[in-house]
Amino acid sequence: MTPRPGGEWSSALSHLALGAVSLHAALSTAQANRGAAAGFLLQALATATMLASGLGTDEDCLAGAWVATVIGLPLLAFDFHWVNGDCSSANLLLGGGMVLAVAGDHLGAEGRSVAGQAVVLVVAVTILIVAVFTTNSYGMWGGVMLGAAGLLSRLEEDRLMLLLPKEDICRWALAGGSWAYHRALHTQRLQWE
């Protein structure tokens, strides 16, 4: 597929947006939700390393993105479930993410891709379910946005009629989902106080 004009700018902007949203969410949730703050911080650090390396496909940058996905997103879900009293699901999600992070070296590139997309979808669906039952509209939007990013990443780009590269759209959706999760955690905290 031929590169789109302005593709590098699009990629840089999507990385900046995701990094800024994740860093803001990490800083503002650090007092009340340390697990979620760590997940947001992992996502911000992964995007920062991608930007610092010039948006390349360096192995270390890809490994950072892998860890941010399989540990960072389950950390977000962990806090979301834990606050609502679903400790077993919280522990299961986080434990599964830790096992995947350790097993990442034993998976091929395709295996890591599929496992990462599965983590995104599982986190999105479980938070969406909790958000529906607790009527947390921000959590619902976050689940939908993260689920859309996970589903879009599975589609073949040449079949899509997109103005931007698929990876950039996924990052924009992830940034929107992260912002919504940040607001959902804030809403949850206000409900419990």
Swiss-Prot record:
The keyword Ligase does not apply. GO terms for cellular component: membrane. It comes from the Eukaryota. Keywords: Membrane, Signal, Transmembrane, Transmembrane helix. Residues 1-32 form the signal peptide. It is a multi-pass membrane protein. This is Transmembrane protein 276. It comes from Bos taurus (Bovine).
